Amino acid sequence: MKTKILSLANEEVGEISLNEDIFAVEFIRDDIIKQVIDWQRAKAMSGNHKTKTVSEVLGTTKKPFKQKGTGNARQGSLRSVQMRGGGVAHGPRVRSHATKLPKKVRKLGLIHALSEKCAEGKLLVIDSLKLDKPKTSALVNILNKFQGKSFFVIDGNEVDINFSLAAKNIYNTVVVPQIGANVYDIIRHEYVLLSQEAVSVLEERLR
């Protein structure tokens, strides 16, 4: 499958052949894409939620009042779960939310996400992702030429430092090397910009 190579000025400068097994899968598996996104989001959760149990709450262990004769329901501790300021029963604990997902499924998710963007016409190949200076305003003007609301930019094995610094303060714009290409960011951004180097490395990686 052939597609245009664009410059950062959004002008056609050539043509490139894309591997159809990676960028033009015939049937897009939305279920696989969702599986991978759920796996990514679960893994990203901090899992540091926690409440204190009866044994962890600070306070006296003294019986609040005698067993009989007060007319109140019997109580053995002020730290019990039914008491104000007491412990929490069955509350959240610190844990990892990460789940396991086979590498083959992760790889398929990436292939189908790239194919979906390509089918929408929102995967663009750029000849070079390099800037002379790390100027945010200059990069904003460049991205405005593509008329998109959000951009996921994938470079080769290394990202140009000027391009990376210029993009840091731009809303809804993420710049990563090819190893950082992931399904969640591909789907949540409107446009995916790939350098020529990124195309060749991704094709080698996902073959």
Curated annotation (Swiss-Prot):
Subunit: Part of the 50S ribosomal subunit.
HAMAP family listed in its UniProt record: Ribosomal_uL4_B (MF_01328_B)
GO cellular component: ribonucleoprotein complex; ribosome
Biological processes annotated in GO: translation
Alphabetical UniProt keywords: Ribonucleoprotein, Ribosomal protein, RNA-binding, rRNA-binding
Function in brief: One of the primary rRNA binding proteins, this protein initially binds near the 5'-end of the 23S rRNA. It is important during the early stages of 50S assembly. It makes multiple contacts with different domains of the 23S rRNA in the assembled 50S subunit and ribosome. Forms part of the polypeptide exit tunnel.
Protein name: Large ribosomal subunit protein uL4
Biological source species: Rickettsia rickettsii (strain Sheila Smith)
Translocase in keyword set: no
Family per similarity comment: Belongs to the universal ribosomal protein uL4 family.
Ribonucleoprotein is among the record's keywords: yes
InterPro entries with a match to the protein in the record: Ribosomal_uL4, Ribosomal_uL4-like, Ribosomal_uL4_dom_sf
GO molecular function, one term: structural constituent of ribosome
